[in-house]
């Protein structure tokens, strides 16, 4: 069994094997063991140094510097802040602040085509082939394909309507199991 101690490699032989060879380890094995020891210390140092970054180093060395270098130190800190990559939360906020393109402005995007069953289902609700919902206004471009909620007063009504629609979709998906909506609940 190999043991490490004070910069050299020692070989411990069990008592029953002491009768055979009394010499040290073979030279190839000793060289391999020394390489392992050197690699282990280097890996250990890398682990310790990976815990700290350059900002920490500047902060720790700041106390040792003379008062003359305070101005340059501030400039270095400002440069580091400018060079720093933005963090996760900064990226998240930037992505939310960027206005996304409207679907009709995306290259290669086409509006969904309604099936004939959907168009013929509610003929009294359609005006010019598009459903007319009160409380919804046209976009700034005047497009009748895309609409947005006009007033916040109607938002609760629309949220209730959307919840009701979700329930009906859920019931339809369970339709193959039950015949009536009362049995589904």
Curated annotation (Swiss-Prot):
Location, primary (coarse class): nucleus
Segments for region (Disordered): 1-29, 121-156
UniProt note on tissues of expression: Expressed in spermatogenic cells, especially in spermatocytes (at protein level).
Keywords from the named record: Cytoplasm, Nucleus
CC annotations in GO: cytoplasm; cytosol; intracellular membrane-bounded organelle; mitochondrion; nucleus
Single GO biological process annotation from the record: spermatogenesis
InterPro entries per the UniProt record, alphabetical: TDRP
Keyword Cytoplasm appears in the UniProt entry: yes
Compartment(s): Nucleus; Cytoplasm
Pfam families: TDRP (PF15683)
Subunit comment: Interacts with PRM2.
Family in the record: Belongs to the TDRP family.
Function: Contributes to normal sperm motility, but not essential for male fertility.
Protein name from the UniProt record: Testis development-related protein
